[in-house]
């Protein structure tokens, strides 16, 4: 089971239509259909009930949907955190300075940095 298959499944389940879901995912409808079919084959379950008017969740799809949403949300959060880490807006900053200098200036700079980047842990 791949996350891209789960994304496709969630999108079809929410759109209720393969065409609309394919458009939103920037896929062709046949490519989307293949992803869903591969997922169903792998699980050995029919997740969606297809009819002339569109698609609705099969009972097994109803069971899978909340789990698929959580997995996708977790992946999105992990990728967002990694982007923040790479951009320097999350992580840890260690600062060492000599107390003999202008301490109020150093303290104000550190306070300003903490305010600007609250997700960065600052050790002094």
Question: What are the residue ranges of the model-derived segments?
Answer:
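A short LG(V/I)-centered, amphipathic sequence patch enriched
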Residues: 40-59
């Amino acid at each position: 089971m791949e996350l891209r298959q789960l994304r496709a499944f969630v999108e079809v389940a929410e759109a209720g239509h393969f065409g609309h879901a394919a458009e939103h995912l920037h896929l062709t409808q046949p490519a989307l259909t293949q992803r869903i079919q591969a997922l169903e084959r792998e699980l050995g379950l029919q997740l969606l009930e297809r009819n002339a008017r569109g698609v609705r969740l099969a009972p097994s799809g109803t069971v899978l949907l909340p789990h698929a949403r959580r997995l996708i949300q977790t992946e999105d959060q992990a990728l967002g955190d990694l982007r923040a880490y790479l951009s320097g807006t999350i992580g840890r900053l260690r600062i060492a300075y000599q107390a003999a200098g202008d301490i109020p200036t150093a303290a104000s700079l550190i306070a300003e940095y903490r305010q600007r980047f609250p997700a960065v842990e600052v050790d002094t």
